[in-house]
A protein has these predicted regions:
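A structural feature that tracks compact, well-ordered secondary-structure segments
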Residues: 6-8, 14-22, 27-33, 42-46, ...
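Acidic, aromatic-enriched beta-alpha/helix-loop junctions
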Residues: 36, 40, 50-51
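Short glycine-rich, low-complexity/disordered patches
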Residues: 50-62, 103-111
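Mixed-charge, glycine-accented linear interaction segment located at domain edges/termini
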Residues: 83, 95-96, 102-109
Length: 111
């Protein structure tokens, strides 16, 4: 099953999206956007930048949990991962984003 972007409108009228793997797990969460167009542009940026390993910044939370940030070519953050239990799990998450993002469909939902 292919991955998909879920584009959501929040109660505040702002937009964000999640990239879900084929198994339904969220593998990337976007920043918040003021407009629908901005969020769709963010999705296109994820599609464009996801295949390049150099666009991933690997980090560790204050609690020691690994996670990653996907950045656009201009250095702007376009998505963050969940917290992982290990670095190998985080690397698997990065590979999943690389695999799923370029061809993922967009599904729009409220909430």
């Amino acid at each position: 099953m292919a991955g998909k972007f879920e584009l959501k409108t929040g109660a505040s009228g702002k937009y964000h999206f999640n990239l879900k793997a084929g198994n339904g797990q969220i593998i990337l969460t976007s920043e918040t956007y003021d407009s629908h167009e901005g969020a769709k542009s963010g999705i296109e940026s994820v599609r464009k930048n996801a295949p390049d390993d150099g666009n991933y910044e690997r980090k560790t939370s204050s609690k020691g949990d690994p996670y990653f940030v996907l950045k656009a070519g201009n250095g702007q953050t376009i998505g963050k991962s969940e917290m992982y239990s290990s670095e190998s799990a985080m690397e698997n998450g990065i590979e999943s984003v690389k695999t799923n993002a370029p061809d993922a469909a967009i599904a729009e939902t409220a909430g």
